Amino acid sequence: MIVSTSVEQSAQFSVKSLTPFGALLEATEDHSDIQQLSIEQLCQLTWEHRLIVLRGFSLLEREELSTYCQRWGELLVWNFGTVLDLIVHQNPENYLFTNGNVPFHWDGAFAEAVPRFLFFQCLKAPEAGSGGESLFCDTVRILQNVSPQQREIWQKTEISYKTQKVAHYGGEITKSLVIKHPITGLSTLRFAEPLNDASVHLNPLYVEVCNLPAEEQNPFINELIENLYLPQNCFAHEWQEGDFLIADNHALLHGRNPFLSNSQRHLQRVHIL
């Protein structure tokens, strides 16, 4: 949802603020070339707004997408390469490749390095009203708005995560809940939400708060999750074919709403370190 008209202008695009955060960059001419835009300017807009959506630009071929993203920085290479196709698999082994929801998480948790940016392009979008929105949570905003007492508790918290590696990630890790953003220096939350009732229960993630009694685990995690989904903290992007979306993977957590099984949802994603 757009809440204000242009807040910044460029000869190549206009910028409109989204609510509760984010910015929409609309090309001044249809089928413009995203490769002609200033990457430095796009980086600054992403740091400022947490995420940017670019609309009215021509899609990139798979190899072209990977080559372009290399101009942003080193790419995280997985067993499938650099470009992940986010589509429904006929016989999925992981919930990412179903039409169920994807709980909030950060990317790169089980990798050697955490990406700075998530870079998406939308090849096919679900029909309006059929679900499949990508969700983003501004964890900087959460930490700025919770009570000092809650912030202090979270700053002392470590959480362990464990999942079997049947897709391109997996293992067992322990991470501090609150970390500093490596670019902006702001405090952020690093949390991965376990599967829930709207999830397809394939390859689940097991979450445990370190040094917390068993009877306090669920209340602690549930309170944290409630903050993630508050309207003032959560942005749902309804995809349109041809959309690009660039997200700050350090400041944001992201997930997905479930969608109809016959929806033709096809995104491509690249991790930029």
Swiss-Prot record:
Catalyzed chemical reaction(s): (2S)-3-(1H-indol-3-yl)-2-isocyanopropanoate + 2-oxoglutarate + O2 + H(+) = 3-[(Z)-2-isocyanoethenyl]-1H-indole + succinate + 2 CO2 + H2O
Domain of life from the UniProt record: Bacteria
Cofactor(s), by name: Fe(2+)
Root EC class: oxidoreductase
Keyword set includes Metal-binding: yes
Any Pfam family hit: TauD
InterPro entries, A to Z: AlphaKG_dependent_hydroxylases, TauD-like_sf, TauD/TfdA-like
Enzyme Commission number(s) from the entry: 1.14.20.11
Signal peptide: none
Keyword Ribonucleoprotein: no
Function: Involved in the biosynthesis of ambiguines, a family of hapalindole-type alkaloids. Responsible for the synthesis of Z-3-(2-isocyanoethen)-indole, a biosynthetic precursor to all ambiguines.
Protein name: 3-((Z)-2-isocyanoethenyl)-1H-indole synthase
